[in-house]
Swiss-Prot record:
It is found in: Cytoplasm. GO terms for biological process: fatty acid biosynthetic process; malonyl-CoA biosynthetic process. GO terms for molecular function: acetyl-CoA carboxylase activity; ATP binding; carboxyl- or carbamoyltransferase activity; zinc ion binding. Gene3D superfamilies: 2-enoyl-CoA Hydratase, Chain A, domain 1 (3.90.226.10). The keyword Disulfide bond does not apply. Keywords: ATP-binding, Cytoplasm, Fatty acid biosynthesis, Fatty acid metabolism, Lipid biosynthesis, Lipid metabolism, Metal-binding, Nucleotide-binding, Transferase, Zinc, Zinc-finger. Residues 30-294 form the CoA carboxyltransferase N-terminal domain. It catalyses: N(6)-carboxybiotinyl-L-lysyl-[protein] + acetyl-CoA = N(6)-biotinyl-L-lysyl-[protein] + malonyl-CoA. Belongs to the AccD/PCCB family. It comes from the Bacteria. The gene is accD. This is Acetyl-coenzyme A carboxylase carboxyl transferase subunit beta. SUPFAM superfamilies: ClpP/crotonase.
Length: 294
């Protein structure tokens, strides 16, 4: 009996049961993993929170029409120039094939949606870029739609609010795309000279020719938290200046800290912030001047 204490225990035997190859019937898209904190949450809960992570506050990218639906009063949006589409002025190989793929992927005809709307009853002309379409690069149609939207705001005496998200100028349109930087900037200047109010909201990412032109020309320049905002890439700058850049370089928080933004606003607070600004700048029908915000 005592000898049993010193004998080696017998190894347990395990049987492997083959899988039948079936998977649990979980609907695709029911869960979303945050790329920032790696937490997994129900997609519906994330959508209820305006696609802002419930755990870390990361702002997930959203499409133009989703953003408009989140922001403006229900039923108030009237789209402008919806059928304006891109040509291929330089005959760039496969360009139109890529445009067609992006149309199918995004449901849009171009990388920006513009139109009339109201926010908490305050009228405005709004433009929202969509990075699913050619990374919202600015070509001739994007520039033209911004120009027309600004002119519409000028004509109707409404503020202009633009949400930017872009990889910069569209290389497939060459010099024509670069011309849009001057074209949009000049439109902003004319509108400003006429007393128009411009609000820009930079979202992730706002880079290249868009950041270097109209995106930075608002009377109010805002950004969503964590947005990448800059002209050239980080590595290019470091190689040029031969210095190591700060960890938070080219983020919305870095720009705010250095006086290049008026505020960094969570998507959850943006509607209230915009409605307040639109209200205090509202022009009274009697005088055409700004109201006292009462």
């Amino acid at each position: 009996m005592l000898g049993d204490l010193f004998t080696k225990p017998k190894k347990r035997k395990y049987a492997t049961i083959p899988s039948d190859g079936t998977k649990a019937d979980v609907p695709e898209g029911i869960m979303t993993k945050c790329p920032e904190c790696k937490k997994i949450m129900y997609t519906k809960e994330l959508q209820k929170n305006l696609m802002v992570c419930n755990y870390c506050g990361f702002h997930h990218p959203i499409g133009a029409k989703v953003r408009i639906d989140m922001l403006v009063d229900e039923g108030s949006f009237e789209e402008l120039d919806a059928n304006l589409t891109t040509a291929n002025p330089l005959g760039f190989e496969n360009y139109m094939d890529r445009i067609e793929k992006d149309k199918q992927k995004s449901g849009l005809n171009e990388a920006i949606v513009t139109g009339h709307a109201t926010i908490a009853g305050n009228p405005l002309v709004i433009a929202v870029m969509d990075s699913r379409f050619r990374m919202a690069s600015m070509g001739s149609v994007v520039g033209e739609k911004i120009l027309r939207a600004v002119e519409e705001a000028d004509k109707t005496n409404k503020p202009f609010v633009v949400f930017t998200a872009s990889g910069g100028a569209r290389m497939q349109e060459g010099m024509i795309s670069l011309m849009q930087m001057a074209k949009t900037s000049a439109a902003f200047k004319r509108f400003s000279n006429h007393g128009g109010l411009i609000i820009t909201v930079m979202t992730h990412p706002t880079t290249g020719g868009v950041s270097a032109s109209f995106a930075s020309l608002g009377d109010y320049n805002f950004a969503e938290p964590g947005a990448l905002i800059g002209f050239a890439g980080r590595r290019v700058i470091e190689q040029t200046v031969r210095e190591e850049l700060p960890e938070d370089f080219q983020t919305a928080e870095f720009l705010l800290k250095h006086g290049q933004l008026d505020d960094c606003i969570s998507r959850l607070d943006l509607q209230n912030k915009l409605s307040f600004i639109l209200r205090i700048h509202a022009k009274t029908p009697e005088t055409g001047g700004e109201s006292d915000g009462e």
